[in-house]
From Swiss-Prot:
Pathway: Nucleotide-sugar biosynthesis; UDP-N-acetyl-alpha-D-glucosamine biosynthesis; N-acetyl-alpha-D-glucosamine 1-phosphate from alpha-D-glucosamine 6-phosphate (route II): step 2/2; Nucleotide-sugar biosynthesis; UDP-N-acetyl-alpha-D-glucosamine biosynthesis; UDP-N-acetyl-alpha-D-glucosamine from N-acetyl-alpha-D-glucosamine 1-phosphate: step 1/1; Bacterial outer membrane biogenesis; LPS lipid A biosynthesis. It is an enzyme of class 2 (transferase). Gene3D superfamilies: Hexapeptide repeat proteins (2.160.10.10), Spore Coat Polysaccharide Biosynthesis Protein SpsA, Chain A (3.90.550.10). The keyword Cytoplasm applies. Its main location: cytoplasm. It catalyses: alpha-D-glucosamine 1-phosphate + acetyl-CoA = N-acetyl-alpha-D-glucosamine 1-phosphate + CoA + H(+); N-acetyl-alpha-D-glucosamine 1-phosphate + UTP + H(+) = UDP-N-acetyl-alpha-D-glucosamine + diphosphate. The gene is glmU. Catalyzes the last two sequential reactions in the de novo biosynthetic pathway for UDP-N-acetylglucosamine (UDP-GlcNAc). The C-terminal domain catalyzes the transfer of acetyl group from acetyl coenzyme A to glucosamine-1-phosphate (GlcN-1-P) to produce N-acetylglucosamine-1-phosphate (GlcNAc-1-P), which is converted into UDP-GlcNAc by the transfer of uridine 5-monophosphate (from uridine 5-triphosphate), a reaction catalyzed by the N-terminal domain. This is Bifunctional protein GlmU. It comes from Pseudomonas syringae pv. tomato (strain ATCC BAA-871 / DC3000).
């Protein structure tokens, strides 16, 4: 059965008190609308149609993709009117309607809903709530069949007592949708064209309204203000924490842990408090991540240890390598197996061979470092001449003394040593000592300056 998905994302979101369109406000590092689109793609539709209005240019700019069709709703005249704007582009047998400010909806829930759709039956997602204030109420007959949805502002006191609420998410046979939308009226308290009115039309036309419910009511929670947005954020993070713990991760405190991307994990991983995982992160078995670390778009091989307060971005850490505390690995950094990067070390586009050591207070940019090479404290690669970047190459078993400046381009070959305090501007041959510093001179009779005293 072919599927079109319509995502309603035209609302202004005035209660957010923001110039940013409501659907672009982030949850876990991705916009709310971005989460909905991600779920929609997993259903393999023939088309994803995003109805936009307020802040349309910003939405297009942030989320433009070949598989998205943006449809303009110039005037916000209700959800039924919004879906009608997408009608000319719909070609599939079934239409699923989602909302751009409901980011936590699970793909499995939508799959169950879609299974309810036949040419003579539509699927409606409802939710049981302790306090359904603000939700449209699901009205059922004496045989428990859905017969209508009544919006909260139009409901009688008896209808307001109903605890089954409408989520707005429904899947309908496309063959009926155009007719129902054409018959909508705005004769209601809001003066809008309610999509929910198609339920009563379907019943009157002899169709069955089959309902499904999410496993968790937060799946269908929207965000109309910053408080609700924060609630979605926290629920998402706890959900991700539970998923990782089920996969074999120990989290010191699941409430102090954030995922802001796509994370895959091995077994027996230990993650301390205040760790943020961003982008695409791969963590293999037996990895340990200390507190207050950020890991972004990186791969941590088996047995890696990242110590406290380290920032790893776009890096590959080989088996049993370690970094930190207070290490910064920037994009293009690679640590070979058992390589060591210590405190206050920054790497950028640098490749450390197996067993190489950079203990502390060092910057290596655009560098190739051979196996077992040791780099002393205070060393920097001078890789930028003001116009272009240049490479520093260190062979295997090199020893770089403390407080060295390696002025690229420069090669220091296998087994070479550089003396402490050197500024290396020329290649150092294998097994030789490079010394590049002024000779020490001791001045006899020298007197320290004396502070001038004021009268």
């Amino acid at each position: 059965m072919s599927l079109d998905i319509v995502i309603l994302a035209a609302g202004q979101g005035t209660r957010m008190r923001s110039a940013l369109p409501k659907v672009l406000h982030p949850v876990a590092g991705n916009s709310m609308l971005g989460h909905v689109i991600h779920s929609a793609r997993q259903l393999s539709p023939v088309g994803i149609h995003v109805v936009i209005g307020h802040g349309a240019d910003a939405v297009r700019e942030q989320l433009a993709a070949d598989d998205l069709n943006f449809v303009m709703q110039d005037k916000q005249l209700g959800t039924g009117h919004a879906v009608a704007q997408a009608l000319p582009a719909l070609t599939a047998e079934t239409v699923l309607i989602l909302y751009g400010d409901v980011p936590l909806i699970e793909v499995e829930t939508l799959q169950r809903l879609l299974k309810r759709v036949t040419p003579e039956q539509l699927g409606l997602l409802t939710v049981k709530l302790d306090d359904p204030t603000g939700y449209g109420r699901i009205v059922r007959d004496d045989q428990h069949r859905v017969c209508a949805i009544v919006e909260h502002k139009d409901a009688t006191d008896a209808q307001k007592a109903i605890t089954e609420g409408n989520t707005g998410i429904l899947a309908v046979p496309a063959s009926h949708l155009q007719d129902w939308l054409g018959r909508l009226s705005n004769n209601n308290a809001q003066g809008e064209y309610y999509l929910t009115d198609v339920i009563a039309m379907a019943v009157n036309d002899g169709l069955v309204v089959a309902t499904e419910q999410p496993h968790d009511a937060m799946e269908v929670q929207g965000a109309n203000d910053r408080k609700q947005l924060s609630e979605l954020e926290r629920h998402y993070q706890l959900r991700e924490a539970r998923r990782l713990m089920a996969a074999g991760v120990t989290l010191r405190d699941p409430s102090r842990f954030d995922v802001r991307g796509e994370v895959s994990v091995g077994r027996d991983v230990l993650i301390d408090i205040n760790v943020i995982l961003e982008g695409k992160v791969i963590i293999e078995d037996d990895v340990v991540i200390g507190p207050n670390c950020v890991i972004k778009d990186s791969t941590l091989r088996k047995g890696v240890v990242v110590k406290a307060n380290s920032h790893i971005d776009g890096a590959l850490l080989g088996e049993c390598s370690d970094a930190g505390p207070f290490a910064r690995l920037r994009p293009g950094s690679v640590l070979g197996a058992k390589a060591h990067v210590g405190n206050f070390v920054e790497l950028k586009n640098a490749n450390l061979g197996e067993g190489a050591k950079v203990g502390h207070l060092t910057y290596l940019g655009d560098a190739e470092v051979g196996a077992r090479t040791n780099i002393g404290a205070g060393t920097i690669t001078c890789n930028y001449d003001g116009a272009n970047k240049h490479k520093t190459t260190l062979g295997a078993d090199v020893f770089i003394g403390s407080n060295n400046s390696l002025v690229a381009p420069v090669d220091i070959l296998d087994g070479a040593t550089t003396a402490a305090g050197s500024t290396i501007t020329q290649n150092v041959p294998a097994e030789q000592l490079g010394v590049a510093r002024a000779r020490q001179r001791n001045i006899e009779g020298w007197k320290r300056p004396v502070k001038i005293t004021k009268d």
